Amino acid sequence: MIVEGPVLKYGDKIDTDIIIPARHLKYTDPAYLAQHAMEPLDPEFYKKASKGVVIVAGKVFGMGSSREQAAIALKAAGVKAVIAESFARIFYRNCINNGLPLITLPNATKEINEGDVVKINVETGEITVNGRVLKGKGITGMALDILKSGGIMEYLKKVSA
């Protein structure tokens, strides 16, 4: 599974309240959530992401309260994948279950810059950027099967058919 796109870069400790503020949690429409993704940190995020982007971030991306809407908002906004130095565990699983690939890469914010175009091999974790190949942690097994299906619901439909 290959994912490619230009980079939007953010720092450490981007929590779910930044990814999708609590005032929007009463809504379930992915298109609505997308318009408010990352709004407190980057009011232009939706416009930038709508072209299809890869987020690069620092440590503990997705920390804070567990909200599936965070993964839904990012994916619906046009985020193709997230590369970070580390992820909050429940956020990581929410993203996999919603079909959004996450790659852990030590020193991601030092290795990749805003505007770079990255090509990610989700299975191996290899990230090609500016002629260099970086080695992140790939996704394998059932998590990869879920991603390839487009999310947990699609995966369950496929395996129960």
Curated annotation (Swiss-Prot):
Keywords associated with the record: Amino-acid biosynthesis, Branched-chain amino acid biosynthesis, Leucine biosynthesis, Lyase
Entries under NCBIfam families matching the protein: LEUD_arch (TIGR02087)
Subunit structure: Heterodimer of LeuC and LeuD.
Function: Catalyzes the isomerization between 2-isopropylmalate and 3-isopropylmalate, via the formation of 2-isopropylmaleate.
CDD domains per record: IPMI_Swivel
EC main group: lyase
Descriptive protein name: 3-isopropylmalate dehydratase small subunit
GO biological process, one term: L-leucine biosynthetic process
Source organism, top-level taxon: Archaea
Gene3D superfamilies in the record: Aconitase, domain 4 (3.20.19.10)
InterPro entries: Aconitase/3IPM_dehydase_swvl, AconitaseA/IPMdHydase_ssu_swvl, IPMI_Swivel, LeuD, LeuD_type2/HacB/DmdB
GO molecular function terms noted in the UniProt entry: 3-isopropylmalate dehydratase activity
Reactions listed under catalytic activity: (2R,3S)-3-isopropylmalate = (2S)-2-isopropylmalate
EC number: 4.2.1.33
Keyword Amino-acid biosynthesis among UniProt keywords: yes
Entry's family note: Belongs to the LeuD family. LeuD type 2 subfamily.
UniProt entry tagged with the keyword tRNA-binding: no
One protein family per Pfam: Aconitase_C
HAMAP family from the UniProt entry: LeuD_type2
Gene field: leuD
Pathway: Amino-acid biosynthesis; L-leucine biosynthesis; L-leucine from 3-methyl-2-oxobutanoate: step 2/4
